[in-house]
């Protein structure tokens, strides 16, 4: 008997609250790669350049990472990451900006505060189920593009040169439909997980 684990990602959202005069501002983002993470963190640090801490955790293609950013070790990033993993989230970055209010919370309350940040933002957000799929290149011409079958796929890049090259995220079933349409050459770049459908948990 096989155990099937459903994986989910999440749509971008923001939440904030205050505990003992410290403000916690939480963001959650859908990410595709480490470049997304770097860009998001740079934008946040520019916008909140006077914050005390920028704590974050992410799960990307089932690889995970967290940082406490000068909070006591294990009290900040890890609690956020644990909540992400508990909810089977993937391709997700959660960032908590803290403005220290002058009152030290202590290790236990601080851990609970960061856990609350992650839990609340997830409850407020749209969850999207993931399924197995592919990142592909479709090499065709303008006639082929006009004859694309009406299927769910995410076109992430278009290159119009001598030939038209679309970079597409697509699930297995729709890849077969695209192949059977015979509108061009298909190259599989890599196996990935793609969005399945929107749902609230």
Regions found by a protein language model. Name each.
Residues 6-75, 157-162, 172, 187-201:
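C-terminal regulatory domains involved in ligand/effector binding and gene-expression control
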Residues 33-35, 141-145, 169-176:
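Helix N-cap motif at beta-to-alpha junctions
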Residues 79-124:
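Active-site beta-strand/loop microenvironment that shapes enzyme catalytic pockets
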Residues 113-122, 140, 186-201:
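Terminal alpha-helical anchor/extension segments at protein ends
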Residues 126-142:
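Short glycine-/aliphatic-rich beta-strand segments at the starts of folded cytosolic domains
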Residues 137-154, 177-178:
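Short amphipathic alpha-helix segments
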Residues 162-172, 176-184:
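Long, charged alpha-helical interface segments
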